[in-house]
UniProtKB/Swiss-Prot annotation:
Sequence positions bearing Phosphothreonine: 443
Record's protein name: Exonuclease 1
Localization per Swiss-Prot or TrEMBL: Nucleus
Modified residues annotated as Phosphoserine in this record: 431, 433, 447
Tissues in which the protein is found: Specifically expressed in the female germline.
Pfam families linked to this entry: XPG_I, XPG_N
Name of the coding gene: tos
Taxonomic lineage: Eukaryota, Metazoa, Ecdysozoa, Arthropoda, Hexapoda
SUPFAM superfamilies reported in the protein's UniProt record: 5' to 3' exonuclease, C-terminal subdomain, PIN domain-like
Hydrolase among keywords: yes
SMART domains given in the database record: HhH2, XPGI, XPGN
Primary site of residence: nucleus
EC number, UniProt record: 3.1.-.-
Disordered, as annotated region: 422-471, 524-625, 661-716
């Protein structure tokens, strides 16, 4: 029954299917397959001639299962035997007769188990058994149709006419009739194997462009079918190889080349085989079926479609001229073999439905107003991670769903916004142009804690918070950032000061961030406390000496005219310059104390002291000027004679490098005079700060040190040129 090995051969074109995947569709069922399975369970009773309905209940299980999945079944039964299958049917009858005789003999011998196997083989499904099932289906409003000849051709037409979207069968011959979707091996769990005609080229191993269904049909006929036996040694594999190799459309010429193409020299292909091959192909194409929509018999495919000679259609059946007889045959009221009338049921009559029986609610194909709804069920697809919501375009809430979808789409971010959020953009750091004119308007520098800076944890500050002094921030371990007064806030707090040096990694705006070295955090505090204690002790001793020796003289203080305001710590440092403390030590310690204690630095507190100091009369100013001149003369007379080394120190002043070149002119003018005055009476021995080492040169033999970039360096100067100090001429 069918083509041997065809279902495994088409494995690449098949897939697993469950009935829930085709919910709401219509299926055509080869009912004789169910009847043969049902008869297998009650073969002993049927062989003995006992009455049973086991096979009926077996078929109804499948019917109820289909109805539970909202699937409309159309049960199709076989009709008359074709002349082409006369030989096949004769062999089947002989086999059943032999099995029946063997079963009776085994029962007489008492070998019951062996007799049962033969009894199953000898049982045949008759039309009377099929009629009992048809009556049960009528009570459930399930359509049944009896084909004029083969049920395979009838089901293929229903599938191609889109009356049924799927076909359920166990006969592999159905694929040769051109069915689109066939379900094999359906069980009571609802699982089956779906074979799709559009994927058959995968089973043949050719591309879709070179594939045609006629090639598949011819391959199956060559391998052997119900209408034609195969040639010796020819199966599906060799038949497929030959069909793919030949390009001849006329099979009468191509079949003669089989021995040479398949390298089978002993194989003979006679004219009788070629004639039977053409008849078998015409039978699969042009078999008669019954059209329930038009209530008439017709061919599966018209002869004009393939330009087939009618003489090859002798095995495809004959047309019944009486349309009324053809209708009752299709309804199951006639015996297809004897044409004896068995029932008089018509679709217009209502069939009584027993209680507790599930009735189908689908429209019958026998109704005159029946039309194919063309409701295609979507095919089973691979599971997808995305969830697609089904939109009902016929419902009343169509506009609401569209508006909701539009709101969701508008709320989503655009592609450009997403790229802007997740893409890394390296920003260029551009050095501002050097402008000679100071009066030209400059845009204020951006905030140093802007999001684009390298510090991702900094927070933006408002206008009020920006005016306040920010706490000390340890940015790196550079000694230059610790000792350079240029890193403090600008002198006058001017807005619009532009940073020029592009080599620095971070640019800080005025009064926003102070830089403090982490390296000298602990050592600087200890050094500052020691120096403060020494200065206090020396200050007390010197006060006692001055009170005893110079009781008549007034205590004089050096006041830098360019820097009128100083904090108390800076005043104490400047008053004790002559006691051995260097200007560099005093400046560094004062800066450190101002940063640690939160006291403004001397340069920063200049503007505040100028505003807070009361106005002194002109006469007082003259007296103070005279006192300063006299005190300077006394100090110059008491000071030792300067050496060549000290002269060079007097002519030079320590200038600190900074990133802020715009404010360097103002700072240099404010500190040049005071630096020059302090350098005039600096002692030869100086205290070293930071990483500097004491000089190893012998006393009395001064040796000038040179620097490749900064030139000659004074011996008395600290070794801080590596951190940004250099010697420059004092601005006059």
């Amino acid at each position: 029954m069918g083509i041997t090995g065809l279902i495994p051969f088409v494995g690449k074109a098949s897939s697993q299917l469950h009935l829930k995947d085709i919910r709401g569709s219509t299926v055509a069922v080869d009912t004789y397959c169910w009847l043969h399975k049902g008869v297998f369970g009650c073969a002993e009773k049927l062989a003995r001639g006992e009455d049973t309905d086991v096979y009926i209940q077996y078929c109804l299980k499948y019917v109820n299962m289909l109805l539970s999945y909202d699937i409309k079944p159309i049960l199709v039964f076989d009709g008359q035997h074709l002349p082409a299958k006369a030989l096949t049917e004769k062999r089947r009858r002989d086999s059943r007769k032999q099995s029946k005789e063997r079963a009776a003999e085994l029962l007489r011998l008492g070998r019951i188990e062996e007799a049962r196997s033969h009894m199953r083989r000898c049982v045949d499904v008759t039309h009377d058994m099929a009629l009992r099932l048809i009556r049960e289906c009528r009570s459930r409003n399930v359509d049944c149709i009896v084909a004029p000849y083969e049920a395979d051709a009838q089901m293929a037409w229903l599938n191609r006419a889109d009356v049924a979207q799927y076909i359920i069968t166990e006969d592999s011959d159905l694929t040769l009739f051109g069915a689109k979707n066939i379900i094999f091996k359906l069980d009571l769990n609802g699982s089956g194997l779906l074979v799709e005609a559009e994927k058959l080229h995968l089973a043949m191993g050719c591309t879709e462009e070179k594939y045609h269904f006629d090639k598949f049909r011819r391959m199956c006929i060559l391998s052997g079918c119900d209408y034609l036996d195969s040639l010796p040694g020819i199966g599906l594999a060799k038949a497929c190889k030959f069909i793919l190799k030949t390009e001849q459309e006329d099979m009468r010429i191509a079949l003669k080349k089989i021995p040479s193409y398949l390298n089978m020299r002993n194989l003979e292909v006679d004219d009788d085989y070629i004639e039977n091959f053409m008849k078998a192909e015409a039978t699969f194409r042009h078999m008669f079926i019954y059209n329930p929509l038009e209530r008439r018999m017709q061919r599966l495919c018209a002869l004009e479609d393939y330009e087939t000679d009618e003489r090859y259609c002798s095995n495809a059946g004959t047309l019944l001229e009486d349309s009324e007889q053809a209708l009752h045959l299709a309804l199951g009221n006639l015996n297809p073999f004897s044409m004896k009338r068995l029932d008089s049921w018509t679709p217009e009559k209502a069939w009584p439905t027993p209680k507790n029986v599930k009735r189908s609610k689908h429209k019958s194909i026998w109704q005159t107003n029946f039309q194919s709804e063309n409701t295609h069920t979507p095919k089973k697809e691979n599971p997808c991670a995305l969830f697609f919501k089904k939109v009902d375009f016929v419902g009343k809430t169509l506009n609401e769903e569209i508006e909701a979808n539009q709101r969701l789409e508008q709320a989503k971010q655009t592609e450009a916004e997403l790229f802007n959020m997740y893409s890394f953009k390296a920003k260029r750091r551009r050095s501002p142009s050097r402008e000679d004119s100071v009066d030209q308007e400059r845009t204020p520098p951006p905030s140093p804690v802007h999001k684009s800076r390298h510090n991702p944890f900094a927070k933006e500050r408002t206008g009020e918070e920006a005016n306040q002094r920010s706490p000390v921030v340890c940015e790196n371990a550079s000694l230059l950032r610790l000792l350079s007064p240029k890193k403090a806030s600008p002198l006058d707090g001017e807005a619009g000061v532009k940073k020029v040096d592009s080599l620095k990694r971070s640019i800080f705006a005025k009064e926003q961030v102070q830089i403090r070295s982490r390296f000298f955090a602990t050592q600087d505090e200890q050094t500052r406390l020691q120096r403060e204690h020494l200065r206090d002790t020396e200050n007390d001793d010197m006060d006692e000496q001055k009170l005893s020796s110079h009781s008549g003289h007034k205590k004089l203080r050096l006041v830098c005219k360019d820097i009128p305001g100083k904090n108390p710590i800076r005043q104490r440092c400047s008053s004790q310059i002559s006691d051995g403390e260097t200007d560099t030590d005093t400046t560094a310690s004062s800066l450190l104390e101002s940063q640690d204690k939160g006291v403004p630095s001397p340069l920063e507190s200049q503007e505040d002291l100028n505003n807070s100091q009361p106005q002194i009369p002109t006469e007082g100013n003259t007296n103070s000027t005279t006192i300063r001149i006299k005190s300077l003369d006394l100090l110059l007379e008491n000071s030792p004679e300067p050496t060549q080394e000290s002269d060079r120190n007097n002519n030079d002043a320590i200038i600190l490098l900074s990133d802020d070149s715009c404010s360097s002119d103002q700072r240099a003018s404010s500190t040049s005079s005071s630096s020059q005055q302090r350098q005039n009476f600096l002692p030869t021995s100086k205290r070293r700060v930071g990483l500097s080492k004491p000089s190893t040169a012998k006393k009395g033999t001064p040796k000038s040190r040179t620097n490749g970039k900064l030139g000659a360096v004074s011996q008395n100067q600290t070794k801080l040129s590596m951190f940004g100090f250099q010697t420059k001429p004092v601005l006059k």
